[in-house]
Amino acid sequence: MSWARKVAMVASLLAATGEGSVAGDFIRVKETEDGAKLQTAVFGYEKDGIRVDLIGAIHLADRKYYEFLNTYFENYDVLLFEMVGGENLGGGKKPIMVEDPEKEDNLAGLRVIYETMEKALGLTGQAGLIDYTAENFVHADLTMKEFGALQKEKGESLLSFMIQAGISAEKPSRDPNTLNLMRGMLTGRSDLVKLELMHTMAEGDEQIGSLAGENVIIGDRNAKCMEVLEKQIAEKEKNIGIFYGAAHFPDMERRLEKMGFERVSNKWLTAWNVKKE
């Protein structure tokens, strides 16, 4: 696997950490002569008067993508969100700063990756713009202790999961053009870098999404989200959004179908809008 593809795979995992039900269904690239757009899906499912929308997240995007989402989320009775260790957010609560050395150690590497890619791509980080204090936000992910314990139990790490995603791919990802990547980085042309990474990111989500099952990063976190969903349904909520990385959604869609939900609508939101030379 080339270094350029590894960069794009890491970016795809951040969107996780869319013929058939594969991740290619939930994230796509739309190209024209003038530009290209990386888009995430909003797919709607219904059962017995209950509406559930899967809203695909990408954790580095254009600022206006997140600004639109903050307004869009107001339409839901409850909005279930992903964030390992985010149990102190949502429900109108102000963020609580908790000193947790284990959490700092686990997330230090990811924070460096986020900051590096934000600068290289000229994008904005999700965590800094999404309003996680909103009244209708409900945490639907593992706590940091749950996440760490499950990874230890299964011998899983972020690195091992990435490697497995690359090995298990049914088809090779499209390699970015290394010369174009370097030219973009050296000249500060973030548009060139994004154009090269778009397709590999979308295909990387497909590879990651294919690994649903007995793993922590996709399978166990999705199971926790479905537990929270069932609780909200039991509390008579009728209009529910789930804001999660697009790579989670092939497995999550299967879980919804087992619950009797059927897909009834789809729309696409533009996360990256890049003009070509």
Residue ranges and their predicted role:
Residues A8-A16:
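Bacterial N-terminal signal peptides
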Residues L14, Y76, L256-M259:
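Alpha-helix boundary/capping residues
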Residues N215, G219, A223-E277:
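A cross-kingdom marker for long, charged
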Residues M1-A8:
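Bacterial N-terminal signal peptides that target proteins for export
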Residues G20-D220, K231, S265-K275:
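Structured, acidic catalytic/metal-binding patches in enzyme active sites
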